[in-house]
Structure formats: C-alpha cells, structure tokens
C-alpha cells in the first residue's frame, strides 16, 4: 500500500490548523474589503547592461504579521496551538525554524501558523482559502518533521566580484554562484530593500555566497555561524584576488527551505571599498579555501595574524587614500615588526618577502617607508592613491604568506632577515600568486 500522506497521519493537527487559517483569512479579507491595502514590493528584473524591469509583489507576510495581535484572539488559534504543541516532532521543527522565540507558543506561531496563512494567501493570490494550497504547504511542513536530518542554508549577495557561470567552492561548506533577486524573493518577499543597489543587473553584482549543510535533527546541535564563515570567505577572496569585494549588508538563513532569519554581517566585509571589480580565477580557489581555514584557526588562537587581519580589513575601507595607505602599511607591523625593529625593518622585510627582483624590492621598500611615515605631520606630499594601491598589494601578499605559515607566522620577521642576509631563499609561491591577481 502507498504510504499515507503526512496530513493523513496527523488529521487532528491538520483540521485544527485549517480552521485557524480559514478564520484568519476571513479576518484579513474583511480588512481589505474595508479599504486597507496590502503593501507591495517592486522586484527588479532584467539582465546586466539592459533596462531594469519591475514586478509587483504583494507583501502578504507583512500584512499578516501586522495583524497577529488580532488573529491570536480568534477562538481557533488556541485550538491550533494546542494541537500542534502536543506533537513533540512538530514542536521540535518549530523551535528549529524560530530560534529566537521566547516560548513554544511563539515558535509555533512564527514557524507554522504564520507561514501557513501567508503561503495560502500567496498561493491563492488573495485571502480565499484553497484546500489544495493548504495541503501542499502543510504536507511539506510535516515532511520536514519526518526527516532525521535538517538542511541549513545561508545566502548573502556579493558585490565587486565577477565570475564565469558555475558553482565555485570557497571551502567551509560555502559556494559562490549566481542567484537572482527573484530567487531570494521567493523565500523573502521583503528582501528587495535589503539588497545592494542594481544587484542582479550590474556584472559585478550577480553572485551570492551560499552555505548549505545537513545537520542532525537533535535539540543540542550547534548551528553554523554563517556570518563569521561568510566574513572569512570574503577576506580570503580579497587577499587572493584583490578588488573591492564586499558581501551583504545582511545574510538570509533558512532551515528545511523555510525562512529562518535575516542577520547582519560584520562591518569589515560590508563597507564599500574603492577600486575596480575583481575577477574570480577558479585555478586559485584552492588558496582561498586554505586561507579561510587558517583564518578560522587564527580566530581561535589569536596572535599577530588575527591582529593584522583586523587592522587590514579596517584600513581597506578608509575613504581617504593617505589614511588607507598608512593603515594598510601599519596592518603588517604585527607580523613583520613584532620584535620592535621599527619602520625601516618592516619595509625591508616586506620587500624581501614580496619583491620579485632587486628593482621591485627597492620600490616596495620605498613605498612602505613612505606609507608608514604618512602619520607624521612632516610627511612629504605624494601620490597617495597610487601609494595605497602598491601598499595594498604588499599587505595582501604578507597576509597570505603569514596565513600560509600558520603557527610559524610569529617567526616571519626572523625568517625574512635570513632572506636579506642571503642565508635562505625567498618564499615565492603564495606571494607570487597574490601579487599577480
């Protein structure tokens, strides 16, 4: 015999929730009949380089949530909550989907009842109850209950990065791929105001970071820190490819394909940066993955790498080129000047690490010394925009080398002194890859 559908297996819950949804839709329809309008969003459509097209999308969720204080007073509300709350499996899914809920009642309301009312309204195109639409949503929810594992997904739009079509593995369960505003709007209709300007239209605004993991359905499982993982990925992309790569300003999370939360991202990876968009080279993604893993280790153990990364991320967003150049040069001091050797030693060590030949090393040393002197009141006037670009490339190379050395990064200064003395060769692989970006 074919397996019974989920709604057949839980007929009491289905009946109680259907009665509440019907009552809620009648209440909402009465508001519309009285002249209240459903708010709407204009979703952007089109292709980069072409005109923007707009699609009208009613925001049923906002309309429903604004009236929940009335809907919870409907007689069928308590019956639905009692029926759903009596099922431990349903209650567990509700807690997963509404992690910030203070009570089980709020979790069931946010994760089950509101999505049902909103889903039926969206599926029916208004506030008429449709059995088929209701059953489809209710059965999908109960299918989640039957699963022994749950899917956890996070999205965040990327700016300042171009790539060929495909899915690009950035490590730590994160991928970069093209995603349209329409795809995001399917789960988050209100997302249009939370996306970067011209997202989905400009060539460097077509990608998103996506975290997708399967987790056991148990109460004490630790959910991924999506914001921190995305921040590592963006910083690793910036180090390897350069360019004004940013993400956010917010990320979108969902569990089992149902919206879970919209969260803020760290300012260090959301602030606008100067420069031309970078191009993702799939051949260098192995380095992005390696650097992101080393950043995770640095977050745990701290030390000079963590300090240097924090300074570099902050300095990269400086709007004044002189401040940016000085900050980028100072960001590598915890790595190259931890022994207190001074600015000259930091500049020489950076040149020894990054310079490809004698002339290149001389230029780097001069640039680093100039940038480190910018904080002084008697600093000479220079082309600080060009200086910031040169020092920025040097800082990226130093950070890549330090992360590549891992726990030995504290000895980077001593190692480079040996390079300057000619007693050991210059490490080349990582710094060459980063500088040629």
Predicted regions and their residues:
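Amphipathic alpha-helical interface elements
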Residues: 2-89, 93-96, 101-111, 124-140, ...
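Charged/polar positions within long, soluble alpha-helices
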Residues: 336-340, 372-380, 396-407
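Short amphipathic C-terminal alpha-helix that caps PH/PH-like domains
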Residues: 230-234, 332, 391-399
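Actinobacteria-biased recognition of intrinsically disordered, low-complexity terminal regions
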Residues: 1-19, 420-437
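Histidine-centered, metal-coordinating catalytic motifs and their short helical/loop contexts
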Residues: 358-392
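Charged, non-catalytic interaction/linker regions at domain boundaries
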Residues: 78-323, 405-437
